[in-house]
Regions:
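Juxtamembrane "helix-exit" motif on the non-cytosolic side of transmembrane helices
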Residues: 42, 67-78, 127-136
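Membrane-embedded alpha-helical segments of multi-pass membrane proteins
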Residues: 25-33, 88-96, 114, 127, ...
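Alpha-helical transmembrane segments in multipass membrane proteins, preferentially the mid-helix core
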Residues: 35-40, 98-99, 151-170
């Protein structure tokens, strides 16, 4: 069991993941299937006594997927768990965090922010998931990456289909301002902490 966990939480010495293969397309197709199911059953979900539990489940998946990244680094010191190298100041990280708060609180302002962050920034992560080069489907990092990125989209489309949220012209401005704020935080953090990334 120990050998399995060491393997599962680690990464390969040679590339294990390739773009445009079944390992790349399967999570994206599963996400699209999730969209279609949410859209088809939106009225039933909205009227269900379990609707709140569904939202909390999506939020829980987002938070756990983000935390799993750091758990993995702590569990495998050779992967470099140095906090300076792994500060949570990336757009995808904050989209996952904001997405969990957005879906739990049904917050339109957070929806405005992450809608554009996901469609502009995280879309490239889905199309070219380069962090997975040494982590194929038999590794935790593969599952953590896809859960974090696909569930962000699931959360947004859940709020669109089930709760009728929509982006508006001011949403783009709000999203851009939030991105500038995040950029300022990242810039000053990188200036204050030598070697920060």
């Amino acid at each position: 069991m120990k050998e399995f966990l060491i393997y599962f939480w680690g990464q390969g010495d040679t590339p294990e993941f390739a773009l445009f293969t079944p390992a790349h397309f399967a999570p994206i197709l599963a996400m699209i299937a999730g969209f279609l199911l949410i859209r088809k059953y939106a009225d039933r979900i909205r009227a269900s006594k379990h609707e709140e539990k569904i939202r909390y489940g999506i939020a829980f998946a987002l938070i756990c997927s983000e935390m799993a990244y750091y758990w993995r680094l702590v569990a495998r010191p050779e992967l470099g768990p140095n906090p300076v190298d792994n500060l949570p100041i990336a757009v995808c990280v904050w989209a996952a965090i904001f997405g969990s708060y957005m879906i739990v609180g049904k917050n339109q302002k957070l929806f405005d922010i992450i809608y554009f962050w996901l469609l502009s920034g995280s879309l490239f992560a889905l199309l070219t998931p380069t962090p997975l080069t040494y982590c194929g489907p038999t590794r935790l990092r593969y599952w953590q990456f896809w859960t974090e990125h696909t569930f962000g989209y699931i959360a947004v489309f859940y709020m669109i289909f089930v709760h009728g949220m929509r982006p508006y012209p001011k949403s783009m401005v709000r999203s851009y301002i939030a991105l500038l704020e995040l950029t300022a935080i990242a810039y000053f953090t990188n200036r204050l902490i030598p070697g920060a990334n």
